[in-house]
């Protein structure tokens, strides 16, 4: 016997192995233990039942690893009596009135089709497909399903491999889709074989072709099959999707990622993500594109064309919506002095940083060495009315001004102060983010933003180095304030410490919103009182009251000596989670504006009268008083007079005097304001004809 004759061929890969091998050397398939039947039974003769029983009882060797017996005769008899579904071609049992797979109604046989009898059907059956071939097809597909192809080098790896053996490329995430596609391919092959058997069992070869389904149920089944085929998807489509997403990500910039994070933040209620996007200068009116929606991959939440406002309304984020709506109204072009003169602004920031010092001693708080108060120049009144209107639109926050004046009388409610005493307050526009408090403080003093976080750093360092002093005041004030509203409770020291740690953390985070305690510390850094005029209640964008704001009142630098502080306060406005600087316009200075008060000022000094009572003539609260400093209204008024220059007007309004002088003001601030105002002086408005010109025209006529 030759060498070729003693080898045995593998039934899977046809590799010729040595006689001693019990498995195939190439594919590891087991060696068959006997002859494999390759002849097709029932080829030219009618099968005999007895012979079929004997044949079914004989041992048949199957190349399948599970060694399933190949029972052919009984299987052919059963399939010949089954009926095929006209929708999915599935072979159902004769007693079934509906298809087991797709539930389609069994169709009645047409007159041209003769009923299937056992004899005729068996005689009409052509050479049936050998079950060996069917099992081989199944095994080939199973082997294919047990491997995955590397997308980088196209090497076929085992299913258990976590990465490619050749190039170490990780396993793709679409293994389920690949297996599903393989299963669909296997079922299609088997259905083709079943369909061939069914066609062979038909009595007449010239039967008419069946008409396509026209009923509503048949149409629905077609749609279901189409949707199922689309859901399976292919590996190529999945790879194209991954490639498309990768291209989108490569095109994304930092601003784009901040915008997507803000959108997710609105859905999940994360306000910090929205503030981070706003602080970076992002456009609040930006809409989601198709690529961005595809990248977010949450169709239930995001849709093309949505903005942050749409998402806030959809998910009922009222706090975010209030801030975003304010941002929309401020979307108009703004032009403040700090924007016109960037070089001077940088010099002023360096001056501020150089003027920050730390006091030596037990109370080691930081403070500013210069007293500066920002006012709008009186030369604005010399501009034409149209230019004045343009200037105020670009430098003021009209929404804040309207809310503090019209919606609730908080500022400029006294005609005596606003008209006769020239003490009208104007709300300057600034950034609507967590830094608005620090911006408004620097705007009320130096006329610029806290862009370099110089004031925030001084705030954090003061809170950290003087934590014991401020903590005692804060704890005592919070306890008294709660009891004043009838809330009698006691907290453990650990809870107080946790709340205080949160206040400290806010001071160190750029863009984080600040609280009343931070205003109290800022009063010590400035070494001057801070008066906050604000709304009393938090309200939603629908106008619903949500709670008390607690910001309005007077903040005195009580931990300093009075001799170390200035008595000229600054004013801030608070509306809907936003602080604004309230400044006055320069005036000529009058000696008789305060009833019974002799100001002893020259014409260069501007005196602004800031009311210490609200529109109902109730004294403003003084924040963070100790138990010894608390008292009745007369005692609090006495305390205000000790820390500020106060007087009573002819109308009986208790006011504090804010004094400023252009001559004594910082030269850099004066130069910045003059350069900003020159831009409006050069604007030539479209004026109408004068009276003299009209008369000349009349004479010509």
Curated annotation (Swiss-Prot):
GO CC terms, sorted: cytoplasm; nucleus
Class of enzymatic activity (EC top level): hydrolase
Gene Ontology MF term list: cysteine-type deubiquitinase activity; zinc ion binding
Active site: 436, 578
Keywords: ANK repeat, Cytoplasm, Hydrolase, Metal-binding, Nucleus, Protease, Repeat, Thiol protease, Ubl conjugation pathway, Wnt signaling pathway, Zinc, Zinc-finger
PROSITE patterns: OTU (PS50802), ZF_RANBP2_1 (PS01358), ZF_RANBP2_2 (PS50199)
Biased composition (Low complexity): 111-121
Domain OTU: 425-585
Binding-site list for Zn(2+) 2: 85, 88, 99, 102
InterPro entries linked: AnkUBD, OTU_Deubiquitinase, OTU_dom, Znf_RanBP2, Znf_RanBP2_sf, ZRANB1_OTU
Biased amino acid composition, Polar residues: 202-214
Catalysed reactions, as listed in the record: Thiol-dependent hydrolysis of ester, thioester, amide, peptide and isopeptide bonds formed by the C-terminal Gly of ubiquitin (a 76-residue protein attached to proteins as an intracellular targeting signal)
Start-end of RanBP2-type zinc fingers: 3-33, 79-108, 143-173
Positions of Zn(2+) 3 binding: 150, 153, 164, 167
Intervals holding ANK repeats: 253-283, 306-333
A Pfam family this chain is assigned to: OTU
Residues annotated as binding Zn(2+) 1: 10, 13, 24, 27
Protein location: Cytoplasm; Nucleus
Gene Ontology annotations of biological process type: cell migration; cytoskeleton organization; positive regulation of Wnt signaling pathway; protein K29-linked deubiquitination; protein K33-linked deubiquitination; protein K63-linked deubiquitination; proteolysis; regulation of cell morphogenesis
Entry comment, domain topic: The RanBP2-type zinc fingers, also called NZFs, mediate the interaction with ubiquitin and determine linkage specificity. RanBP2-type zinc fingers 1 and 2 (also named NZF1 and NZF2) specifically recognize and bind 'Lys-29'- and 'Lys-33'-linked ubiquitin. RanBP2-type zinc finger 3 (also named NZF3) binds 'Lys-33'-linked ubiquitin and shows weak binding to 'Lys-6'-, 'Lys-48'- and 'Lys-63'-linked ubiquitin chains but it does not interact with 'Lys-29'-linked chains.
Family, as annotated: Belongs to the peptidase C64 family.
Protein name, entry field: Ubiquitin thioesterase zranb1
Organism field: Xenopus tropicalis
């Amino acid at each position: 016997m030759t060498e070729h004759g003693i080898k045995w061929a593998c039934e899977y890969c046809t590799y010729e192995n040595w006689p001693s091998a019990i498995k195939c050397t190439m594919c590891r398939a087991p060696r068959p233990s006997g002859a494999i039947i390759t002849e097709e039974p029932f080829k030219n003769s009618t099968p005999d039942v007895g012979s079929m029983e004997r044949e079914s009882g004989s041992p048949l060797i199957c190349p399948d690893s599970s060694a399933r017996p190949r029972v052919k005769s009984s299987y052919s008899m059963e399939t010949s009596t089954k009926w095929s579904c006209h929708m999915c071609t599935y072979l159902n049992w004769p007693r079934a009135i509906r298809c087991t797979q797709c539930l389609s109604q069994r169709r009645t046989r047409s007159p041209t089709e003769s009923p299937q009898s056992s004899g005729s059907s068996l005689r009409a059956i052509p050479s049936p497909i050998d079950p060996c071939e069917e099992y081989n097809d199944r095994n080939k597909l199973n082997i294919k399903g047990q491997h995955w192809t590397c997308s980088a080098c196209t090497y076929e790896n085992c299913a258990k491999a976590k990465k490619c053996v050749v190039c170490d490329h990780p396993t793709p995430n679409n293994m389920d889709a690949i297996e599903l596609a393989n299963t669909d391919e296997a079922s299609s092959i088997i259905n083709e074989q079943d369909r061939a058997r069914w066609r062979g069992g038909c009595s007449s070869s010239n039967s008419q072709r069946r008409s396509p389904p026209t009923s509503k149920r048949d149409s629905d089944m077609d749609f279901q099959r189409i949707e199922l085929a689309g859901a399976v998807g292919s590996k190529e489509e999945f790879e194209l999707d991954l490639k498309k997403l990768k291209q989108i990500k490569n095109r994304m910039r930092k601003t784009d990622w901040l915008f997507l994070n803000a959108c997710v933040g609105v859905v999940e209620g994360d306000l910090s993500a929205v503030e981070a996007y706003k602080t970076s200068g992002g456009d609040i009116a930006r809409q989601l594109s198709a690529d961005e929606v595809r990248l977010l991959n949450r169709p239930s939440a995001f849709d093309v064309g949505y903005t942050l406002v749409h998402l806030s309304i959809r998910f009922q984020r009222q706090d975010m919506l209030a801030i975003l709506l304010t941002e929309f109204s401020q979307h108009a072009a703004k032009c403040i002095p700090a924007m016109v003169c960037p070089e001077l602004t940088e010099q002023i920031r360096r001056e501020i940083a150089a003027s920050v010092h730390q006091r030596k001693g037990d109370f080691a708080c930081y403070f500013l060495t210069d007293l500066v108060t920002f006012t709008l120049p009186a030369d604005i009144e010399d501009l034409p009315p149209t230019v004045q209107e343009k200037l105020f639109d670009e430098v003021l926050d009209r929404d804040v001004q309207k809310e503090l004046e019209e919606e609730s009388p908080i500022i400029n409610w006294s005609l005596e102060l606003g008209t006769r005493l020239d003490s009208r307050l104007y709300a300057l526009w600034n950034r609507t983010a967590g830094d608005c408090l620090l911006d408004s403080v620097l705007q009320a003093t130096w006329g610029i933003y806290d862009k370099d976080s110089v004031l925030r750093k001084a705030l954090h360092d003061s809170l950290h180095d003087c934590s014991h002093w401020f903590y005692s005041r804060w704890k005592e004030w919070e306890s008294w304030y709660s009891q004043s509203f009838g809330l009698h409770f006691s907290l453990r020291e650990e809870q107080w410490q946790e709340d205080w740690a949160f206040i400290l953390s806010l001071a160190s985070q750029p863009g984080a919103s600040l609280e009343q305690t931070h205003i109290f510390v800022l009063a010590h850094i400035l070494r001057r009182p801070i008066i906050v005029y604000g709304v009393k209640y938090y309200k939603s964008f629908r106008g619903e009251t949500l709670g008390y704001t607690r910001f309005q009142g007077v903040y005195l630098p009580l931990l300093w000596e009075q001799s170390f502080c200035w008595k000229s306060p600054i004013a801030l406005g608070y509306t809907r989670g936003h602080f604004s600087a309230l400044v006055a316009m320069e005036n000529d200075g009058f000696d008789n504006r305060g009833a019974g008060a002799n100001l002893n000022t020259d014409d260069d000094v501007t005196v602004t009268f800031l009311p210490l009572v609200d529109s109902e003539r109730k004294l403003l609260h003084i924040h963070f008083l100790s138990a010894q400093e608390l008292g009745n209204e007369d005692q609090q008024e006495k305390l205000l007079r000790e820390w500020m220059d106060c007087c009573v007007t002819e109308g009986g309004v208790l006011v504090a005097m804010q004094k400023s002088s252009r001559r004594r003001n910082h030269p850099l601030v004066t130069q910045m304001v003059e350069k900003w105002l020159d831009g409006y002086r050069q604007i030539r408005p479209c004026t109408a004809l004068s009276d003299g010109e009209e008369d000349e025209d009349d004479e010509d006529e």
